[in-house]
Every structure is written in C-alpha cells, then in structure tokens.
C-alpha cells in the first residue's frame, strides 16, 4: 500500500499543483493564442495541435502535440506549459517529460492508445492531471499517480452541463462517504473499485486529496464562477475563449471571474460587453464516450 501522506515524490508533485489553485489554464494551439492567455492572467497553457472544438469535428487519430510546437510557444511566454498525451501512451509521456513540460494531461480528448491500461504516473517526475466523471474514477487515477484531477465534461462544446454533472457527482459521493458508519466504508470502497487508503484519506479531508479543476464546456465568466462556487480549485478553458467574438476580453474576464467567483458585482462587470460567446453545441453526444469510465477503467 502506498502512503499518500508521506512520500517525497508524491508530496513534491502535489505541492506544485497546490500552487495552481485559483487559476485558469487555457488550451492553445499557437503563439498568438498563448500570448492572449498570458496577457489575460492565465497560470498556464495547454498546448495542442487543435483545440477541442476542432478535434470534435475530425475523424482522424488525435495524438500528442509536435514537441517543436511546444518549444516555439514556450520561448514566447513565461507561464506554465502543459501538454496532453493519449491514455496509456507512456512513450508520449516520456518524450514530453524529456522536453521538461510543467505538467502532462493523460487525456480522453486524444485518441486512446491503450484500451485497458492508464499510464503508471508514479514512474514520472512530471505531475499528471487526469479526467474523471465520478469519485471512484478520480481515486483510481490518483492511485496511478495523478497529482491533479479535472472533470471530463464535454470539451469543445461550450456546453457546461456534463462538467456540472461530474462536479456534483463527485461532491455528492464524497458527502455520502463522509456520512457512512466506519463499518460501511470498506464495502463502499469495493463498490467504487477504489483503494481503501485513498477512500479513508478522502473521508478525513472531506474532499479529493489532490487539486481538482473543472473542465469541459466552460465558455463564459459565469460558467467559470459557477464551477468555482461548486467547490472547484480552478478551471481549464480553451474553445470557449478562442471561438468567441473577442478572445482577449473573454480570456481576461474568465480569469477575473475565477478570482472573484463569490462577488456578483465583479462578475457582472466582467460579463459586460464581451460580444458573442462561442456558438456551442447543445447535442451532447460525447464523441469520446468510448473512453469513458464506464467502458474502460
């Protein structure tokens, strides 16, 4: 059994993620977008070949970004640089760790590389973020070495409904865990298929034992603030910015909304005059459903 409260490597990676709390990480695909994100006050950029809204409309294989693009963008900004790898593709992760990116996202948005196994993230010095739809999935990813969790949501749709569903599901399952008699906890752990040590730690903390960001469909300052009011530590956003009428203003407003999520007056001010938000998609069909928790992990 791994001791999650007393391990130097784990504590170092988790500690780095703690510094991201209250921040916004933005999906970008070029230098121009990265500069918009930095100017807006983002704490980091997630570099992709295409933002999620574009990935949803393609049928080809979505792979990790060309390392050269990461180098080009990193030279032009001073904030954290993140990159996605395919689920289970530990060699993509090795390559990007060698490139010294700040964080890796083992992402369902890319085409899955291994249908049965996620990456053993304990083998890496670079912290990982992974998506989840429920508490059991979150704790399994943490047991594999994830230092940060995010909701899966519906990336690239501008539709926040799935992200909110995942946030509330995790929150409600934690509340239920905390309400159980001690003798009932072990059976609940079996139902979640989650390690008992992480179940007990979550019960003690009354929250996930790692930083937890919202992601998937966040398109407005109000969306971002709603996620924060539901207990998230920060947000990922991409298509919602760069498919809006005024990306720079939208990006800055979302950052302000996350920093002031409990202040309606500021939320009103940052929501004024943003122009048209991304068109979005109300048909939440989940292009990446085959990579969902129910099917794979």
UniProtKB/Swiss-Prot annotation:
Q: Name one GO molecular function term.
A: pyridoxal 5'-phosphate synthase (glutamine hydrolysing) activity
Keywords of this entry: Lyase, Pyridoxal phosphate, Schiff base
* Superkingdom, natural source: Eukaryota
Q: Name one Pfam family in it.
A: SOR_SNZ
The positions flagged as active site in the entry are 84
Listed binding positions for D-ribose 5-phosphate are 27, 156, 217, 238-239
An example of a Gene Ontology BP annotation on this entry?
Answer: pyridoxine biosynthetic process
Q: Which pathway is this protein engaged in?
A: Cofactor biosynthesis; pyridoxal 5'-phosphate biosynthesis
Q: Where does D-glyceraldehyde 3-phosphate bind?
A: 168
In short, the EC number is 4.3.3.6
Q: What is the residue range of the signal peptide feature?
A: none
Resulting phenotype, residue 103 to F: No effect on glutaminase activity. Total loss of overall pyridoxal 5'-phosphate synthase activity
Enzymatic reactions:
aldehydo-D-ribose 5-phosphate + D-glyceraldehyde 3-phosphate + L-glutamine = pyridoxal 5'-phosphate + L-glutamate + phosphate + 3 H2O + H(+)
Q: Which InterPro entries match?
A: Aldolase_TIM (IPR013785), PdxS/SNZ (IPR001852), PdxS/SNZ_N (IPR033755), RibuloseP-bd_barrel (IPR011060)
The record gives the effect of mutating residue 82 to A as:
No effect on glutaminase activity. 4-fold reduction in overall pyridoxal 5'-phosphate synthase activity
Q: What does this protein do?
A: Catalyzes the formation of pyridoxal 5'-phosphate from ribose 5-phosphate (RBP), glyceraldehyde 3-phosphate (G3P) and ammonia. The ammonia is provided by Pdx2. Can also use ribulose 5-phosphate and dihydroxyacetone phosphate as substrates, resulting from enzyme-catalyzed isomerization of RBP and G3P, respectively.
Could you give the subunit structure recorded for this chain? Homohexamer and homododecamer. In the presence of Pdx2, forms a dodecamer of heterodimers.
What is stated as this protein's family in its record? Belongs to the PdxS/SNZ family.
Its recorded name reads Pyridoxal 5'-phosphate synthase subunit Pdx1
- The protein's organism comes out as Plasmodium berghei
